[in-house]
Amino acid sequence: MRQNCILSILTVLILTTLSDGYENYLYRDYSVRNTYNLYDLVNNPAFLRLNNHEDLMTYEIRTGNQENGYQRAFDPERIETAGVDIFSYKALDEKSALATRIVYETSSLNNLYRSLEKDFYSDYFSYTDTTTGDVSYAGPRLSVIYNREIFSRLLTGLQIDYGIERGLKDVYTKCESISRNINVIWGLGYSSYSGTSLGASVRYFDRQGSYEAVKEITDAIVNTYMGYHIYYPEQPRSTNEKKVYAEGIEIDGQLSKKGFLVPSLKIEIAGGYGAKENSINAGGSSNPVQRGYWIREGGFANSILTYGGKQSKIGLELMAGLKRYHDWASPGDYDVINIENSITDIHYGIKTIIPIQSISLTIGYEAGSEDVNYHEYTVDYVFDEQLSRSLIFTDVDISLNQVMQMHYSVWFSNFEPWFYWNTSSIQTQGIEMGVERLFVFGKIGVSFQMEFWKPNDEMGSIDHFGIAFSFKK
């Protein structure tokens, strides 16, 4: 339902990974819980105008808190986040449209043990020292999308995303970091009057990161990890620096067909292939050396089959997909591979949408498996496992009256994590509630979310809380 889409936007992924927006990842993760339009399938800017028919302006303020009662070695005890999000869409004329988004986010990582990274586990060559302290991050992000119909039903679009973020640790080594990220997508699309749409896009992304750790006390030693088990101790000096250079390219395609086999059936297929390279330099500011270099390449495919329409009583959606990639990493001093990682991820899901007068009830199930073959050759460590996951969810959208809608969600999931979690499985449960009301001047909404992670047979849990306020006109 339309209300469901709006209220989902209002929450804006409060519990997403902290580094999202200041980092670019290959491919994307699909979930049957979400609704995907032509633009969303692969973020093809050529289809932006087909999914937006009215000018729109939204403002959102959100805040979140995560208490890590259960921690990995390099996790903080608590994470506090806050952000402001402004989005605008405007049709310039009958053939072109422009969308912009400005986001400013802050986050505080409290009692972070040794790590000088925002997420130690997201890289094979992470920076640490020997202190525990608080780290604060802040920075803006800007997105601009321009879309135009160049011939009858033939569309093109350009999307540019830019983000910058600064971080500072409050104890020596007083590590200061800055991350600059750019993402550019150019797309073509064709949408026929019969309901068939074809699209292709090319994406280039680039990231540069800089870390500067100042020595003040003798035991504040800086290290560069190579994998998750060994590290290189940097030489004691007044200033240690780390530079990260990453860039990649991805080519995606998509197909959508309404009236597939029967009038109420729609099929959507998306796929892509890409590669990303990362170079890490560390040492003194006058003579940095390469500490590591790693490459990721692979691809994905995803399909969605949707049944529903004006003549149907219920809606049904099936989803299935595959993601596969391979990593190679080598230390800077030697021309050998010391880390190799292969991932094959399969997912599938089903959901049904049942309208009951003024209520829309969605019930769904999702499952998947991640086949991991991770090998560190220097210490001869192998993690070769097939990790399973599952999710059950229910969404309820209620039209209380002509000017007020309410949204309610509850979900339960279980997944088997990587070795650095030190537990065999983690169970999660969450709840989200939101309400939106129409006034003469626009719509005001509020959404609240809670999610709890409980490791198997372990003391403690990870508790997430978030709230968002929005205004739309």
What are these regions (language model features)?
Residues T17-N110, D123:
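N-terminal, post-signal peptide beta-strand-biased segments of exported outer-membrane/organellar beta-barrel
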Residues M57-I61, T100-I102, L158-I160, W186, ...:
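Membrane-embedded beta-strand positions of outer-membrane beta-barrel proteins
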Residues I61-E67, Y104-S108, R148, Y162-R166, ...:
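Transmembrane beta-strands of outer-membrane beta-barrel pores
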Residues A91-K95, E149-R153, S191-G195, K258-V262, ...:
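Outer-membrane beta-barrel channels and translocator barrels
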Residues R114-S126, R203-Y245, E277-G292:
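Short, flexible helix-coil linker/hinge segments at the edges of structured domains or between repeats
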Residues I230-I353:
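Long, internal scaffold/assembly segments composed of regular secondary structure
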Residues S461-K473:
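Outer-membrane beta-barrel "beta-signal"
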